[in-house]
Amino acid sequence: MENKPVTLDQAIQRGNTTITEVQLRKPQAGELRGLNLADVLQMDVNALIKLLPRITTPSLTEAEVGNMDSADLLQLGSKVAGFLMPKKMGYLAA
């Protein structure tokens, strides 16, 4: 599975740095600790706010994810949900 960076519709400003792209990686089991998998798969906002800082490069903060443009949160959440689907189901995250 090719893991391309996600280009944000609305850049995140962090001090003098502007974040325009975010790389996601498939979460390991320990990174899902404390989260309900059904919530993650349903792209529950609270679950994504907790999970995304654990699996993004650059590492986003919970506050940055919470203030993120909703279209960008949907893009990232869709990719996370795709990571969690078994390969035999025929769905690969873009």
Regions found by a protein language model. Name each.
Residues E2-A94:
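Short, surface-exposed, charged amphipathic helix/loop patches that serve as local interaction elements
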